[in-house]
Amino acid sequence: LISLSLVPPALLVLIGLCSFLTGGRPRLSNAMGAAGATAASLLGLALTIAALLGPGAQSLSLPWNASVGASFSIGLDPLTCFFLLPIYGLSAVCAVFGFGYLGGMRNADTSGHGSGSQRTGSSWLFFCLLAASMALVVLARNAVLFLVAWEIMSLSSWLLVTHEHEKEEARQAGVTYLVATQIGTAFLIVMFLVLGAAGTASSPAASPIGPDQGAVLDFSRFAGSLGPGSTALPVAGAVFLLSLVGFGTKAGIVPLHVWLPEAHPAAPSHVSALMSGVMIKTGIYGILRVLTFLGAPEPWWGWTVLAVGAASGIIGVLFALAQHDIKRLLAYHSVENIGIICIGLGIGLLGVSYNEPVVAVLGFAGGLLHVINHAIFKGLLFLGAGAATHATGTRDMDRLGGLMRRMPLTGIAFLAGAAAISGLPPLNGFVSELLIFLGAFHGVSQGGIPQAVGGALAIGALGLIGGLAAACFTKAFGISFLGEPRTPEAAGAREAGAGLLIPMLVLAGACVAVGLLGPYALVLLAPLAAWMAGVQPESVAGLIEPARTGLESVTLAAAGLAVLAAALTLLRVLLQRGKEVSRAGTWDCGYGKPDARMQYSSSSFAQPLTGMFAGLLRTLRRWQPIHELFPSEAAFSTETPDVFARGIFHPLFRGAGSALSRLAWLQHGRLQLYVMYLAAALLVLLVWRLS
C-alpha cells in the first residue's frame, strides 16, 4: 500500500496537466478536470481506508539527490491516514461542485477577461496540484520533501486565490497570503535546521555531506534526537515554538490569521471550501507531527496551545459576528474552529504532562474529531455560500434575503451546516465539542489544581464560543435565507443545479451521519488519540467507556427529538392534504405593508453583541448627517477590518517595504549586472559547499 499511496497524487498532477493543455476547449477541460480529480481523490480515499484496516505503519525511501539532506521518504501511519481522509474526501466533493461552478462562470462570463473560459484549464491544474501537494505533505518523511510539498501547496493555493487577478480584491488578498505563508515557511526552515543539527549531534556518524546525507533530515532521525536530558529541553522548547509559529500561520491561529479572511473570500467557492476545510489543517498536522519528535511534553506547551486556542476561538467568532460578507464571515469561523481544535489539543497535552490519561485521550480525541467535522461542515457552508453567490452575484448578506423560498434545497443544506458548526445535537459538531468538554470536566473534577484551572479555562472558552457561534449563524442564515429579498438579484434567484446541489447534500448527510454515529467515531479514533497521549492501547477501552456511554445517551436523546419533530411535521402535512389552508401574515407591529428595508440588517442584528466588545472590534461607522426635520434620504454603514492586520501587520509591512525600497538601486534593468549577481551567488554557494 505504501507504493500505491503515491498513485493518487501522481494521477491528480497528470489530470491537472491534461485539463490545462485542453484549456482552449473549456467544456472538455472542465469535464476532464472535474471527473479526473474526483476519481483520483476517491481512489486515494479507498487506499487510505485500506491502509487503516491493514497492517501498522509502513515506509518507503527512494534515492533523491535534490539537495543536501534530501531523500524521497514517505510513510503511512495512523496520523497520516487520519489526515488523508478529509484531504481526499473533501477534494472529491469540491471537484464535483467545481464542475458546475466553473461551468456556470463560463456561461455567464461577459467581463471580457475570460475568467469563465480561458482560465478553466489553469484553475483545474492549480486545484489538482493543491490536492496532490496536501497529500504529499502528510505522506512526507523527510524535511526537504516536506518543504517542497509545502511550497507547492502554498503556491498553488495562492494562484487559485489570485485566479481572477483583474479584481483588486484578489490581488490584495494574494499579496497578503503570499507574504504570510512565506513568513511561516521561514520559521519551518529554521525548525528543521535545528532538528537536523540535533540529529547530527546525537549521531555524529551521520554527516550532512556524507553518503548518509539523506538520513540527517529524515523524520526517523528527528524522533530520537531530542530525548530526555537537561540539554535537550531548551532545544525541544525552541522547536515547539518554531513549529507553533510556522504551522500556526498556515492554520490561522490568532494573531497569525490575518491572511485568512482576505484569501478565502477571494478564491472560487469550491477552492475556499478546500482551503478552509483541509488546507489549514495541514498546520495542525504539522504541529502534531513535530510533537511526536519531541518526547514527553512540558506543561507550558499545553498551556500555550490552550491559551492560543481560546484566544483564536473567541476572537475569531467575534469578528465573524461583525461581518457583512458571508464568505468573510465563514473565514473568521475557520479561525474560531482552529481555536476549538487547539483547545482540545491543549487539554490533551496538559493531560499527558500531568499524567491524567483520561483527560489526555478525550482532549486529543475531541480535537482530532473536530478536524474531520470542521472539514465537513465548513466545506458545506462555503459551498452553500458559493451557490447563493452564484445565483445572486453578491456575497453581501445585506443584499440577499428570501432565498429559502427560491433555493429551498440549498437553504436546507446551509441550515444543516449552520446547526453543525454551532454545536447542536445530533450533528457532528456537537460530538467533537462534547468530547473536549468531557475531557475538561474530568480535569476539573478528578485532577489537581493545574488540571482544574486548564479545564475551567477550556469550559469557559468553549461555552462562550458556542453561544456566539449560534448567534452568528442565526444571523447568517436568517439574513441571507429568510425574510424578503432585499435586491432584484435576490428576488430572481433560482435553485442551484444538480452539480452544485449533490455535493452540498452529501456533506449535509455526513454532518448527520457522523453526529448519530458519534460513539462509534470515538471508539475508532481512540487508538490514535491514545498513541498521541502515550497511553497503552489495551487500556483505551476502559478509559473512554464512560465518555462513550454518555455520548451515546445524549446522541440517542437528540436523535429521538429530531425524529419526533420530523414525525409531527409529516403528520401536519398529511392532515392538511386535500384541505383548504388559509394563510395570513404574522403580527406586523402596526406596519401593514412592510418594506424590505425594514428588516434587520446583518450589522443591526449583531449590534447587541458586537457593542459589548466594541473596544476589541473597533468597528468603523459612516453616516450621512441629517439636517432637515423630514429628511428625504439617509445613509449609514459599518465596516470591521481586522485590528491585528491594521494595528500590527500593516505598519510592519509598510516599514519593511520602506526599508527594502532603499535597495531599489540594485534593480536597475541592466541584464549584464543581473548575470553578475547570479554568478556571485553561485560562487558563494560553491565555496560554502566545498568548505
Where do the PLM segments sit?
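Hydrophobic alpha-helical membrane-insertion segments
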Residues: 35-49, 182-194, 414-426, 503-524
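Aromatic-capped, Gly/Pro-kinked transmembrane alpha-helices
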Residues: 520-563, 571-691
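Hydrophobic transmembrane alpha-helices and their helix-loop junctions in integral membrane proteins
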Residues: 93-107, 121-146, 156-495
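Hydrophobic alpha-helical transmembrane segments
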Residues: 73-88, 227-247, 450-466, 542-566
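Transmembrane helix-loop-helix hairpins at membrane boundaries of multipass inner-membrane proteins
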Residues: 1-6, 17-125, 199-231, 527, ...
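Hydrophobic core of alpha-helical transmembrane segments in multi-pass integral membrane proteins
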Residues: 13-17, 37-48, 91-92, 192, ...
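N-terminal signal-anchor/start-transfer transmembrane helix
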Residues: 7-25, 245-248, 252, 313
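Transmembrane helix-loop junctions and nearby membrane-interface residues
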Residues: 20-24, 45-55, 92-102, 139-142, ...
